[in-house]
Amino acid sequence: MKRQLILEDGTVLIGTGFGGEIEKSGEVVFTTGMTGYQETLSDPSYCGQIVTFTYPLIGNYGINRDDFESIHPSVNGLIVNEICDHPSNFRNEISLNDYLKERNIPGLAGIDTRKLTRKIRQYGTLRGRLCNMDADVEYIVSQLKATVFTDHVKRVSTKDPYPSPGRGHRVVLVDFGMKHGILRELNKRDCDVIVVPYNTTAEEILRLSPDGIMLSNGPGDPKDVPEAIEMLKDIIGKVPLFGICLGHQLFALASGANTSKLKFGHRGLNHPVKNLATGKVAITSQNHGYAVEEESVENTELEITHVALNDGTVEGLRHKKFPAFTVQYHPEASAGPEDANDLFEDFLTMIENFKKEGEELCQNA
């Protein structure tokens, strides 16, 4: 079955279709990960996107029950050079092709993914549509140019609060499109977690008496989530806070900094990040199309703690007065390296220190 990818600039790439027999549009992006395709498909941060894998062979270990980052995949399509139809792994339960058919997600194989990746790197992220061979190219191009992708966070966030009980610190986890890996890391440390929707107010969060607040990852432009920015303006300084990815960007906006769209984003498992305090470099997992503008941090109460070595963009922030820090990358590493996993320990240490300071103030009052 032939299928084509039509880009908003008029480019047409023809290959072999697999997965769902449906036409879908989305923002065409690329990821450099050699593995972790199951986590990528189920990562809500990819909501509404058509993901191109730069590694030539995808699907060779199949799909299993353990590696999902959300219950429902949010991607709009998948592009690979070659798909493996006969996976071999002791955990394999279903092939990638069959999984995409079940979920009605279209795929395209047999195209030059290097050519597509170079185009995205040169011209920036492009809107595209996976469609059948009889599609009207001129009409599709005109529709793509007029399309605006918004409200992704609303689509992937939980609709109602729910608990993930533990005996340790109570952490309110604000879900902007949370990866399950973040929740797993908190559960591993016996945190008493309450997951809340993206539009939960500061008053509602504080009513839960949290010891700490965690801001999850999520898809799209942080400026599309004004409710969260207003919530954070009322929260910062009252409770220890740790943000990841979109949570990092929202924290920056609430603190007076600015964000902007990257030319083609950071997506992959091998992005080097430098800790400015220690000089150490961590290899990190990343997935974002927006970043905090470095110059916008200067007139705020934030300090830059980490930078990307590939392009110098801001990768970490800390508040100068209050117990709050954020990172642009994914310390939970699902999938990816675990170099930054100790940031969860730093968060819990910050909670403990904040509690001790409060107790000392009460004793001295």
Swiss-Prot record:
L-glutamine binds at S45, G218, G220, L246, Q249, N287, G289, Y290. The keyword ATP-binding applies. Signal peptide: none annotated. This is Carbamoyl phosphate synthase small chain. Gene3D superfamilies: 3.40.50.880, Carbamoyl-phosphate synthase small subunit, N-terminal domain (3.50.30.20). It catalyses: hydrogencarbonate + L-glutamine + 2 ATP + H2O = carbamoyl phosphate + L-glutamate + 2 ADP + phosphate + 2 H(+). GO terms for molecular function: ATP binding; carbamoyl-phosphate synthase (glutamine-hydrolyzing) activity; glutaminase activity. CDD domains: GATase1_CPSase. One of its GO terms (biological process) is 'de novo' pyrimidine nucleobase biosynthetic process. Belongs to the CarA family. SMART domains: CPSase_sm_chain. Residues 170-357 form the Glutamine amidotransferase type-1 domain. It comes from Bacillus cereus (strain ATCC 10987 / NRS 248). Coiled coil: none annotated.
